[in-house]
């Protein structure tokens, strides 16, 4: 099927494009991206039989890519399935997501990787790129078979949800990953220092009678992994950056030429620890929401390029796992359907330009993962069309996700994906 997207503002930072243009899609790929598609050799009669999208007043951008999503399947289908997670992703404008390996069983082998890929194919929505486990069973004791995982379709490895505590094992993991050209996505947390903590350490935690988690829990491991990255030359990606100290360490490492990249999530540049006031478990996550100083450091890191990508860390949980005492409530929030609207606030507030935001949500994730970049002719037609002026209210009961654990319910946001096109197929509108 041919699709003609006409009259939209095409923003493709990878190819230096920011102009009103038409895009023609044929056989799942970008055939033409020009100001005057209708004047090329394609006949008007054939174009008239195509599906046509009037994108006037809309933004047409390379498909958004979320490098950090928990789809929960296999094992926790009551929280999310690959089908529902992909539906949520498509609704949020994401043409591709990376599925973290902390499933049950853990994705540490070919069979689980192929299961995830087959389920994603059956869903027929956003692309799913499985992330394999650094260690067998996320145990931190024995490395997974990286060659087998890569051959099955894994692009990166991670023990996300848990840190790799053993420095010797992490060094071996980096050396092994480098040999197979796999990205390591590191969950940076010192569990001994974090023991018992449920929110950011500080005056608010003291007043609430809760055990705090100091910033050093994250930054200590960030600095360790940067040192191992410099030692091994492996590609390292720091997950869910939340502290000023981590931003500073990553910035300095990049100046030294270290092959490290980093991500953060909208909750870390939008909220602070104040969101847990009243023991709001929908604002409980790991890493926890931090101080205003940390939030500002995250914004500065996004602005100066220290932080490469915006992800969701989409972590679905049932209401029973959230509607309980703060100490025992599950960590994590969902974000696939709110991320774009929250991230566009950075443009509205002058923190990022629109082009830079698209880099953080599409171009940079593609580059880090080794995927096709931008809307170049011949690339897969993975495209997100955004209405930047659409004002909408977050209503969790309308989410495509099976879960409702968001601290943003009731928020008014501006900007929303109106079409998500994956491989030339319209997945949502």
Tell where the protein language model's regions lie, with residue ranges.
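N-terminal metal-binding scaffold of metallo-dependent hydrolase/deaminase domains
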Residues: 1-41
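Divalent metal-coordination and catalytic microenvironments
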Residues: 8, 23, 28, 57, ...
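Active-site metal-binding motif and surrounding structural segment of the metallo-beta-lactamase
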Residues: 44, 48-60
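Metal-associated gating/positioning segment near the N- to mid-region
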Residues: 55-120
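Alpha-helix-loop-beta-strand connector modules within alpha/beta enzyme cores
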Residues: 110-127, 175-186, 342
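Histidine/acidic residue-rich metal-binding segments in metalloenzymes
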Residues: 141-310
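His/Asp/Glu-enriched, well-ordered alpha-helical/loop segment
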Residues: 207-235, 282, 303-304, 308-310, ...
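C-terminal cap of metal-dependent C-N hydrolases
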Residues: 325-328, 377-429
């Amino acid at each position: 099927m041919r699709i003609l997207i006409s009259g939209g503002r095409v923003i493709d930072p990878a190819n230096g494009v920011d102009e009103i243009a038409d895009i023609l899609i044929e056989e799942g790929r970008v055939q033409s991206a020009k100001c005057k598609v209708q004047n090329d050799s394609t006949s008007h009669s054939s174009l008239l039989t195509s599906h046509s999208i009037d994108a006037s007043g809309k933004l047409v951008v390379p498909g958004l890519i979320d490098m950090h999503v928990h789809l929960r399947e296999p094992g926790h289908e009551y929280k999310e399935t690959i089908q529902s997670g992909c539906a949520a992703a498509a609704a949020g404008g994401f043409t591709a997501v990376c599925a973290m390996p902390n499933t049950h069983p853990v994705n540490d082998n070919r069979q689980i990787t192929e299961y995830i890929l087959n389920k994603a194919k059956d869903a027929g929505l956003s692309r799913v790129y499985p992330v394999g486990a650094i260690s067998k069973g996320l145990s931190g004791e024995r490395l997974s078979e990286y060659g087998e995982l890569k051959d099955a379709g894994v692009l990166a490895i991670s023990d996300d949800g848990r840190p790799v505590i053993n420095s010797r094992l992490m060094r071996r993991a980096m050396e092994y990953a480098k040999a197979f050209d796999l990205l390591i996505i590191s969950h940076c947390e010192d569990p001994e220092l974090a023991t018992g903590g449920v929110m950011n350490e500080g005056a608010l935690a003291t007043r609430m009678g809760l055990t705090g988690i100091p910033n050093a829990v994250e930054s200590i491991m960030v600095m360790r992994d940067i040192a191992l990255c410099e030692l091994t030359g492996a590609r390292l990606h720091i997950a869910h950056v939340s502290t000023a100290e981590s931003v500073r360490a990553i910035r300095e490492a990049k100046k030294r030429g270290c092959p490290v990249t980093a991500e953060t999530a909208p909750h870390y540049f939008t909220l602070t620890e104040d969101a847990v006031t009243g023991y709001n478990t929908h604002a409980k996550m790991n890493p926890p929401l931090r101080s205003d100083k940390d939030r500002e450091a995250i914004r500065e890191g996004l602005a100066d390029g220290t932080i490469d990508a915006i992800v969701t860390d989409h972590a679905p949980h049932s209401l029973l796992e959230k509607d309980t005492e703060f100490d025992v409530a599950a960590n994590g929030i969902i974000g696939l359907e709110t991320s774009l609207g929250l991230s566009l606030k950075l443009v509205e507030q002058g923190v990022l330009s629109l082009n830079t935001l698209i880099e953080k949500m599409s171009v940079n994730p593609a580059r880090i993962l080794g995927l096709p970049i931008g809307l170049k002719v011949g690339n897969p037609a993975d495209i997100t069309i955004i209405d930047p002026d659409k004002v909408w209210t977050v209503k969790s009961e309308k989410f495509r996700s099976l879960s409702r654990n968001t601290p943003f319910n009731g928020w008014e946001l501006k900007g929303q994906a109106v079409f998500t096109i994956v491989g030339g197929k319209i997945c949502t509108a």
